[in-house]
């Protein structure tokens, strides 16, 4: 499923392709690209839930906005998000790429993935997808994109 999400994000969203693609056509394109039907269905459902945030149909948990509060992760969250992922989320909050609400959206979308393996690089892409879909997060998206591609480009040299 995560591979389908990455393909969709890179092909349609990140490259600013036509976003209003017919779902049947999109499913055909993904099937033609070699993706499994169940993975396609799960990825589209995942994106639908993400779009609910954009449309205001879903809201993250109501959170205390005390700047001194600290996020305690559940066992399930710790199993999916290792220490480096949790540290990266904290870092993004500290530099104000994420706020309490967008952090919770990211965590919720990570937990909704049906993948056995999940690492820091995967988390960065989920963060980009979430920020891209939330109105008013354009600057945060741009900062996150710079962080992601700046680090990756530096690794190539």
UniProtKB/Swiss-Prot annotation:
Coiled coil: none
A matching Pfam family: DUF494
Family recorded in the similarity comment: Belongs to the Smg family.
NCBIfam families, A to Z: PRK03430.1 (NF002897)
InterPro entries referenced in this protein's UniProt entry, alphabetically: Smg (IPR007456)
Protein name: Protein Smg
HAMAP family, A to Z: Smg
């Amino acid at each position: 499923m995560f591979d389908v999400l990455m393909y969709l994000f890179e092909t349609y969203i990140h490259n600013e392709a036509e976003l209003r693609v017919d779902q049947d056509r999109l499913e055909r394109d993904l099937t033609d690209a070699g993706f499994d039907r169940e993975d396609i269905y799960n990825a589209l459902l995942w994106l639908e839930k993400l779009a609910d945030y954009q449309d205001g149909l879903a809201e993250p948990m109501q959170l205390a906005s005390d700047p001194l509060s600290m996020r305690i992760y559940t066992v399930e969250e710790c199993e999916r998000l290792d220490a480096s992922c949790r540290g990266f989320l904290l870092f993004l909050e500290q530099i104000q790429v994420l706020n309490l609400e967008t952090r919770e959206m990211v965590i919720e979308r990570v937990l909704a993935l049906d993948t056995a393996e999940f690492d820091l690089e995967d988390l960065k892409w989920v963060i980009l997808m979430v920020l891209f879909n939330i109105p008013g997060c354009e600057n945060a998206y741009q900062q996150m994109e710079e962080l992601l591609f700046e680090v990756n480009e530096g690794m190539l040299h």
